[in-house]
Design a protein with these regions (language model features):
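Short glycine/proline-enriched loop/turn "hinge" motifs that connect secondary-structure elements
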Residues: 83-84, 136-137, 536, 693-699
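Short glycine-rich, low-complexity/disordered patches
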Residues: 29-38, 61-64, 83, 242-247, ...
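Broad, structure-driven detector of short, well-ordered beta-strand segments within folded domains
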Residues: 197-199, 390, 689-695
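Catalytic-core signal marking the mid-to-C-terminal active-site face
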Residues: 583-750
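Gly/Ser-rich phosphate-binding catalytic loop and adjacent alpha/beta segment
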Residues: 2-354, 392, 400, 417, ...
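Phosphate-binding chemistry for phosphorylated carbohydrates and sugar-nucleotides
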Residues: 149-150, 156, 170-182, 215-236, ...
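Internal, charge-rich low-complexity segments
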Residues: 95-109, 239-243, 248, 408-411, ...
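Extended active-site and interfacial segments that coordinate phosphate-rich ligands
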Residues: 106-112, 213, 218-230, 407-410, ...
Length: 750
């Protein structure tokens, strides 16, 4: 079948599929119209583009094969839209089935698999890179850092992007091995580069890849610049903008490599080995400046901390053990069993069957189960000696920690001897420890956290005289809010409550019914002195310390770390606390019970993804997500009428959080406005116990969060209180899923 024969068949097949799906209720009218307007025209454009033959000779034959096989749903999902350009760049599926991903791993970027404008492939990466390169040249930008993690063909995607930037005259700094995202975000300001890119999809399952884009200070681009990049460059980019300069043709002084002290054995430096910069050492030395225990190395000689580590097939496999070792820890037990310490983007230790795809997420209890069982296989009879077991995700920007449970509390965890600490408890403990060790000048300090992160952080900060800034979800918001405080704009946000400015304020009038684009609420920030960020954190296992005002907008904060999350840094911080606890004859688990809960009360946070694994697939999955949101908005109306309860708890108030940031994807209509930051139902007047439904804007999934609180004066038997609130959390999720018609049919290790 040639192109002329395929196009009319494709047009007819696409329309028939969309009409039938609409009539059957599998897609809604808005999605139908968008797909009808876009799919065939995008397909025709690709098939008639001669540049694609040059860049990816197997692309068109694979598309024609899909048309001949009448794979209309796959064709629609490949071409119904452009890959969505969001806060951090682009992210999406490379293909819709495992066989195609395996084929790409074996055959390379030009593997004969179905590609389109809505999949992550070499054409999309090259076109996006050309758009970003043109944006940068118009702004006078000259230097860029590029890296990649363990994702399938990550190196090839990164090298292709680098060749585009070399053609456009940039000086390129290219990592010579899979690297953690935070090493990229550190390298950018360290090298005075202008931008950075990491090929990664963070903790998403094996089907995904992406393009994380950072600005000169290592944070994500702010919303205004991001919109300029998309509206003025990405949207109008064509394959004609794609030009390549191979590494071996790069001009002198234009191509440098980032790595360790010596060249990697199996890496081709194109004859430029002399241009290797030891970035690993610089990043490590920077992190070590945050150590508060001066004699840690000597301490480890006499009372060594027993640390387990699991890379989950990711780029932390070398970086994290190296950092811990250099800091002075002697007993690091890396999990090598089942290939978990090898960079493998297929993530073979995680479920990959269609519809059940698991994420290599260190904050997921099932990932912790994989790590624990693999550790026991790898190091027989050693698990009982472990103090902590650390895990990081594929790009090592998230960190999870497994700890042993006291015997008398194991019934809380179905008899298990271990548990995965929630990020909420973990970050509260990190903050508590560092406040104890650095208690001076509290009036100058503040913390930043997302609105889905536990109020245990807010409480313990306030009780120690520290200000609090809550933002919407995403480290880009944490960094942007911190920059607002650095710039002295705290007065603009002291009147923001539940994300909304006062209606009669200037910003309130401008925003109307929309929430502030960044800030959720501030506490204790009105003294005019707070300028030093001592912690920035998220419920989703991300952490950093942003420091004080930077000397310029291209630098890290004064005394601060990277402006995005860093799992390697978090591992370093947690290990120090665990070592200190061991010196005191206690554990992380006991510290939380004995130092945190008695001070702030018991906060029990719950989290579930919907669906439990992956996302609702394709255009039909988009309809399912919207249907669940419509039901949630219906529950909001019931709550406002005073008629709603969950698991026997009456809802006292409710809010919808909407900034409008995804209105380009989900245009508002008379009957539906996308609640991008979610809906929240409160069970108490103090708003400390609540349930939140939050959708993904760029994927077909949702997040459910709960927070239940018991005042310290009401705790009594702490273990009993834990049991009661954990039990109620499970009941809340069950009732919520029943009401939303989103059953938890695959939740494992509850």
């Amino acid at each position: 079948m040639n192109i002329a024969q395929a196009l009319p068949l494709a047009e007819q097949g696409i329309l028939h599929y969309l009409d039938e799906a609409l009539q059957a209720g599998r897609i809604d009218g808005q999605l139908y119209q968008i797909a009808r307007d876009n799919t065939y025209s995008a397909l025709e454009k690709w098939l008639n583009d001669p540049k694609i033959d040059e860049l990816s000779p197997a692309a068109k034959p694979a598309i024609l094969a899909a048309i001949a096989a009448q794979r209309w749903e796959d064709v629609v999902n490949a071409f119904r839209q452009e890959v969505r350009f969001g806060t951090g760049g682009i992210r999406g599926m490379m293909a819709f089935d495992r066989d195609s991903i395996v084929r790409m791993k074996q055959d390379g970027l030009d593997a004969p698999i179905l590609k389109g404008s809505n999949t992550i492939n070499n054409i999309v990466i090259l076109k996006t890179s050309a758009a970003v390169a043109k944006f940068g040249k118009d702004k006078g930008l000259e230097k860029i850092v590029l890296g990649y993690d363990s994702r399938v063909r990550g190196f090839d995607f990164a090298a292709a992007a680098a060749q585009v930037f070399l053609h456009y005259g940039y000086t390129v700094y290219f990592f010579d091995a899979p690297c953690p995202y935070p090493e990229v975000t550190y390298a950018i300001p360290a090298l005075k580069a202008d931008m950075g890119i990491l090929i990664s999809a963070s903790h998403n399952d094996y089907r995904y890849n992406g393009y994380k884009l950072s600005c000169a200070n290592g944070s994500q681009f702010d919303p205004i610049e991001r919109d300029v990049i998309y509206e003025q460059y990405v949207k109008s980019a064509t394959t004609a903008d794609i030009h390549l300069c191979p590494f071996d043709q790069a001009a002198d002084g234009k191509l440098f490599f980032l790595g360790g002290e010596t060249p990697e054995e199996n890496f081709d430096y194109a004859g430029k080995e002399q241009n290797l910069i030891n970035m690993h050492a610089r990043h490590l030395d920077h992190i070590k400046t945050f150590l508060l225990t001066e004699n840690l190395a000597a301490q480890q000689e006499t009372k060594p901390l027993e640390i387990g580590y699991c890379a989950f097939h990711g780029a932390g496999n070398v970086a994290v053990p190296r950092l811990l070792k250099e800091t002075g820890y002697k007993r690091i037990w890396t999990i090598t069993k089942n290939g978990l310490n090898e960079c493998d983007g297929l993530f073979p230790q995680f479920e990959y069957r269609a519809g059940l795809e698991q994420q290599p997420d260190p904050g997921d209890m099932r990932a912790a189960h994989i790590a624990v069982e693999s550790f026991k296989d790898d190091h027989p009879n050693k698990f009982d000696d472990l103090d902590i077991l650390i895990g990081t995700d594929p790009d090592a920007d998230r960190c999870g920690v497994v700890v042993r449970v006291p015997e008398e509390q194991r019934f809380l965890y179905e008899g298990r001897e271990w548990t995965l600490l929630s990020a909420d408890d973990l970050w509260t403990l990190v903050l508590w420890y560092r406040m104890q060790r650095q208690s001076d000048a509290a009036e100058n300090k503040f913390v930043t956290l997302s609105h889905t992160t536990s109020d245990s952080v807010t409480r313990i900060a306030q009780q120690n005289g520290i200000g609090v800034v809550k933002t919407w979800v995403g480290f880009a918001n944490l960094a942007a809010a911190t920059a607002e405080i650095w710039n002295g704009h705290y007065r603009d946000y002291t009147e923001v409550v539940d994300g909304r400015h006062l209606p009669d304020s200037a910003k309130g009038k401008d925003l109307g019914n929309l929430c502030d684009p960044v800030i959720f609420q501030c506490y204790g920030m009105d003294n005019g002195k707070r300028s030093v960020n001592i912690a920035a954190m998220e419920q989703s296992n991300g952490f950093s310390i942003l420091g004080g005002p930077p000397p310029d907008d291209r630098s890290l904060g004064q005394g601060g770390h990277v402006r995005d999350k860093d799992g390697t840094f978090a591992a370093f911080l947690v290990a120090e606390i665990a070592a200190w606890a061991k010196e005191q004859g206690t554990t992380l688990y006991r510290l939380i019970d004995e130092k945190i809960y008695p001070e702030v009360g018991l906060f029990v946070a719950g989290y579930q993804a919907d669906p439990i694994d992956g996302e609702y697939p394709g255009i039909e999955g988009d309809r399912l997500k919207k249907a669940i949101l419509r039901r949630a908005l219906g529950l909001l109306q019931e709550a406002l009428a005073g008629d709603l309860e969950f698991a026997g708890l009456p809802v006292k108030s409710a809010c919808v959080y909407r900034t409008g940031k995804y209105d380009g994807i989900y245009p508002p209509t008379s009957d539906f406005e996308f609640p991008d930051e979610g809906l929240r139902f409160f069970f108490d007047d103090e708003k400390l116990s609540h349930l939140t439904i939050r959708p993904s804007g760029t994927g077909n999934s949702l997040r459910f969060h709960t927070q239940l609180y018991r005042e310290k004066e009401q705790l009594g038997d702490l273990v009993k209180s834990k049991y009661e609130l954990h039990f109620l959390t499970r009941q809340l999720f069950k009732d919520l899923r029943d009401k939303l018609k989103a059953p938890e049919w695959l939740l494992f290790l509850k």
